[in-house]
Amino acid sequence: MLLALAQWLQNDYGFLRVFNYLTFRAVMASLTALVIGLGFGPFVIRRLTELKVGQAVRSYGPQTHLVKAGTPTMGGVLVLIGIAVSTLLWADWGNRFIWIVLLVTLGYGAIGWVDDYRKVVHRDPKGMSSREKFFWQTVIGLFAAAYLAFSVSETSNMRVLELFMEWVRSGLSLNLPAKSHLIVPFFKEISYPLGVFGFIILTYLVIVGSSNAVNLTDGLDGLVIMPVVLVGSALGVFAYVMGSAVYSKYLLFPHIPGAGELLIFCSAMAGAGLAFLWFNAHPAQVFMGDVGALALGGALGTIAVIVRQEIVLFIMGGIFVAETVSVMLQVTWFKFTKKRYGEGRRLFRMAPLHHHFELSGWKETQVVVRFWVITMMLVLIGLSTLKLR
């Protein structure tokens, strides 16, 4: 919005040309989201407390968590407001990628909000059923995947429609342009054509998987938000590179026109995330809830698909992956041993993985900071793929 206003007035006020610089708007988007979060945070927390939107704590979990009972949840609303307002202020409204990422983010946020609302307001411990939640995640994920399959390689929505019609006329056999191929990090000559259906399936898995993985990681004070900020910021760097004809050519990446504008969204996400951490640091004054975790995970997955860095997201989000795999292994092993031996056995003291380390003697703050450090290392490895190819 501010970009359009500045472009309209810049002939009379030359200093407004600074709005044409993506990096300037990215910095301002981050600062705006940070100020919104810090400014409205106390009000949101106070309001959630008045509404008695308190988090229930499992009695069979780490005993140190019992003191958290009643801490207001659904604080992810604060993050989403900061991201949405800042992005709409500083991003180019004509950019189609901004709108699809906002759609996924706010759509998944709505799913999480309904789930949280049922849990804490209606006192329904189950919230949304797994089937209902998965259904709506699938609807949004498939819509985004189908659009991006024809959008990533094109420069406008008209070209998206033309490519779609070409695919239909070809009997659904048309291969997508090379820009839509799966990029293998560290190898500049290797990429895999996916086809329309392959692209849609992979995109769906990345978006839905990332959303749920981030949600599983959100279990300790400050644990999930810093990895989200770090990974999101790194994806912003990739977006800037892929959106630049000069940098993408120099670093041997496909040029994706319009992808650079996602740096605005990533910067807003970083600012909003740091503001939330101010209140979520141990001992937390507010929890994120599904409304924030599902949304942020969906955003990371969508951005990774647009900038063709699905595998790099898997690397940088290694903590999210480890948390998810620990749950899958725990459930699978428990069911297998119960069927085989008549009693369920566990691989970990408790899943997700962060609870295993807590029950192994690590303090909550140790788990959180060590997971942050691991994420920093993985993000640096991911960023190194920009040049080490």
UniProtKB/Swiss-Prot annotation:
Its cofactor is Mg(2+). It is a multi-pass membrane protein. GO terms for cellular component: plasma membrane. Its EC number is 2.7.8.13. InterPro entries: Glycosyl_transferase_4 (IPR000715), PNAcMuramoyl-5peptid_Trfase (IPR003524), PNAcMuramoyl-5peptid_Trfase_CS (IPR018480). Pathway: Cell wall biogenesis; peptidoglycan biosynthesis. One of its GO terms (molecular function) is UDP-N-acetylmuramoyl-L-alanyl-D-glutamyl-meso-2,6-diaminopimelyl-D-alanyl-D-alanine:undecaprenyl-phosphate transferase activity. It is an enzyme of class 2 (transferase). The chain crosses the membrane at residues 25-45, 74-94, 97-117, 134-154, 190-210, 222-242, 259-279, 286-306, 311-331, 366-386. It is found in: Cell inner membrane. Catalyzes the initial step of the lipid cycle reactions in the biosynthesis of the cell wall peptidoglycan: transfers peptidoglycan precursor phospho-MurNAc-pentapeptide from UDP-MurNAc-pentapeptide onto the lipid carrier undecaprenyl phosphate, yielding undecaprenyl-pyrophosphoryl-MurNAc-pentapeptide, known as lipid I. This is Phospho-N-acetylmuramoyl-pentapeptide-transferase. The gene is mraY.
